[in-house]
Swiss-Prot record:
This is Protein GAST1. It comes from Solanum lycopersicum. It is found in: Secreted. Belongs to the GASA family. The lineage of its organism: Eukaryota, Viridiplantae, Streptophyta, Embryophyta, Tracheophyta. It comes from the Eukaryota. InterPro entries: GASA (IPR003854). GO terms for cellular component: extracellular region. Induction: By gibberellins. Inhibited by abscisic acid (ABA). Six disulfide bonds may be present. Residues 1-25 form the signal peptide. Coiled coil: none annotated.
Length: 112
C-alpha cells in the first residue's frame, strides 16, 4: 500500500514539475513576442533618430509638397519604423535604405 502511494505521489510530482516548466516556457515566449512588438513600434534601429525627432524632420521633408497631410502621415509612419528621414524635401532616399525599401502592396514607394 505504501509503495503504491509513493508511486502516485511521484507521478503527481513529475506532472506538476512538467506543467511548471511548460508554463515558464510560455511566459518567456510571450515576453519575447511583446519585446518584438515593442521593437517594431519604435523602429528597426537602422537610423539614429529618436521617435520624438520624427515630427520636425517630417515637417521639413513635406514642406514643399501640395499634399501635406498624406505626406506627413506616411513620413511619420516611415520614420517611426526606420528611425531616419532622408535629407532635403525630395529624393536622397539612398541615405535611408529602410525608408527607401518599404513598399506598398502595389510595389510603389510607401515613404515620401
Amino acid at each position: 500500500m505504501a509503495g503504491k502511494m509513493s508511486i502516485v505521489l511521484f507521478v503527481l510530482l513529475v506532472v506538476f514539475l512538467t506543467q511548471n516548466q511548460v508554463s515558464r516556457a510560455n511566459i518567456m515566449r510571450d515576453e519575447q513576442q511583446q519585446q518584438q512588438r515593442n521593437n517594431q513600434l519604435y523602429g528597426v534601429s537602422e537610423g539614429r533618430l529618436h521617435p520624438q525627432d520624427c515630427q520636425p524632420k517630417c515637417t521639413y521633408r513635406c514642406s514643399k509638397t501640395s499634399y501635406k497631410k498624406p505626406c506627413m502621415f506616411f513620413c511619420q509612419k516611415c520614420c517611426a519604423k526606420c528611425l531616419c528621414v532622408p535629407a532635403g524635401t525630395y529624393g536622397n532616399k539612398q541615405s535611408c535604405p529602410c525608408y527607401n525599401n518599404w513598399k506598398t502592396k502595389r510595389g510603389g514607394p510607401k515613404c515620401p
